[in-house]
């Protein structure tokens, strides 16, 4: 639908809220593992650092991680989750199995929390994958893609958010906020429609 479509705005709002839930789940899991001696790290390296070091980090991270969010959510949730639900009829299977695979496939990214042990990283991302799996079945693909996009933008813009330059920090914060634009636009459009409705005089009966 159009960006002013209330359904799109609602998906955007839900995506941001789901992203906050994922952040809370990740934080709790990382802190719990940290108390057990796990090593925590969050510093993009290798291929994932290229976007931050490009001529236009804002555009590069927006486009690159939108592609990542689309591919991963289509693969893990839309295709695998839907297929498992149709085959088993069990929602928990459609949520948990793709989440486990999602967590395991991210173990090589040792800059994600937690750095060590490797299974801690798999556990954290499996929990996040379960949130996205539940959200996909509850709210649909668009909300989950926007949530995933928001999460990746935050994680991989972290070095810029922690910079000493206020302009860089502002640009990074605005980049992370981009998935919330449909929610803002839809809210403004709804406000305009309500204002116009109040100004329209009632039709006089003949």
Where are these regions (language model features)?
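Transmembrane helix-loop-helix hairpins at the membrane interface
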Residues: 23-42, 46-202
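Membrane-interfacial, low-structure loops and terminal tails that flank and connect transmembrane helices
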Residues: 1-11, 84, 194-206
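Interfacial transmembrane-helix boundary/kink motif in multi-pass membrane proteins
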Residues: 1-27
């Amino acid at each position: 639908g159009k960006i002013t479509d209330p359904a799109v705005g609602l998906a955007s709002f839900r995506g941001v809220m789901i992203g906050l839930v994922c952040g809370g789940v990740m934080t709790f899991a990382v802190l719990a593992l940290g108390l057990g001696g796990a090593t925590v790290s969050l510093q993009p390296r290798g291929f994932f650092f290229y976007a931050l070091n490009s001529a236009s980090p804002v555009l590069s991270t927006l486009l690159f991680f939108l592609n990542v969010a689309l591919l991963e959510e289509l693969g893990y949730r839309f295709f695998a989750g839907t297929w498992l639900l149709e085959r088993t009829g069990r929602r928990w299977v459609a949520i948990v199995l793709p989440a486990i695979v999602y967590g395991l496939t991210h173990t090589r990214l040792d800059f994600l929390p937690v750095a060590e042990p490797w299974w801690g990283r798999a556990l954290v991302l499996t929990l996040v994958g379960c949130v996205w799996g539940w959200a996909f079945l509850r709210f649909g693909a668009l909300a989950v893609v926007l949530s995933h996009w928001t999460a990746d933008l935050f994680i991989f813009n972290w070095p810029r958010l922690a910079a000493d330059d206020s302009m860089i920090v502002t640009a990074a914060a605005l980049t992370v906020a981009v998935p919330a634009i449909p929610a803002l636009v839809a809210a403004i459009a709804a406000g305009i429609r309500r204002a116009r409705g109040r100004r329209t005089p009632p039709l006089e009966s003949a």
